[in-house]
Amino acid sequence: MTDQGIVKINASLRENVGTGPARAVRRNGGIPAVVYGKNRDSLSVFLSDREFLSKHRSAALSTHLIELEIGDKKEYVLMRDVQKHPVTDRIQHVDFQFIDYGTEIKIEVPLIFTNEQKCIGVKRGGVLNILHRTLSIKCLPNAILQNIEIDLSDLTAGHSIHVSDLNLPPEINVVMKEHNPAIVTISSTSMEKEGEGSQEPTAAPSSEN
């Protein structure tokens, strides 16, 4: 993965853990965080509130590989959870996971739907139904997708786009409970259906006596 796909964030080790020390970190403009992983000791760290919010707004951190700089060490991690205050919405805590470059990881990738206004089915009165807004995938860390774009322009009423219709790289494995589920469909409106069946019947030829 190129540097363009990696987000760099500074962190510092926390000497004291628990509710009291965590509150002190927040009062001083920090965000408590933990880094965990298989066969690794967990690290308690804190982040700069200002830096993290800036990076969080500018990139979808949950689908970016993160280079966490902890003192003079660098750790590659994924952001796994962000806890927010229920009233103020301020970030209270962040969970990161250590990454092993040789081991596949599972992530939820957002689906971006494009050309809805050009969609044939919508222009003809159909109703767009989005069934999934994310796709669960497994891949190596250097193959992470930030998002998946789905072009709706050619979708017609009564048709769907399924997982198998997506042009995904071969190194991406889709992990879904259903086999090849539909992601988006266009359903016909009742008015459209009535319009299709409201053609005046052809008059039968009159017989002359």
From Swiss-Prot:
Sorted alphabetically, which keywords does the UniProt record give? Answer: Ribonucleoprotein, Ribosomal protein, RNA-binding, rRNA-binding
One GO term under biological process is: translation
Q: Which CDD domains match?
A: Ribosomal_L25_TL5_CTC
Which molecular-function annotation in GO is an example for this chain?
A: 5S rRNA binding
Sequence segments annotated as region (Disordered): 188-209
Asked whether the keyword Ribosomal protein is assigned, the reply is yes
Q: Which SUPFAM superfamilies match?
A: Ribosomal protein L25-like
Q: Name one Pfam family in it.
A: Ribosomal_TL5_C
Q: Which family does it belong to?
A: Belongs to the bacterial ribosomal protein bL25 family. CTC subfamily.
How does this protein assemble?
Answer: Part of the 50S ribosomal subunit; part of the 5S rRNA/L5/L18/L25 subcomplex. Contacts the 5S rRNA. Binds to the 5S rRNA independently of L5 and L18.
**Function, as annotated:** This is one of the proteins that binds to the 5S RNA in the ribosome where it forms part of the central protuberance.
Protein name, UniProt field: Large ribosomal subunit protein bL25
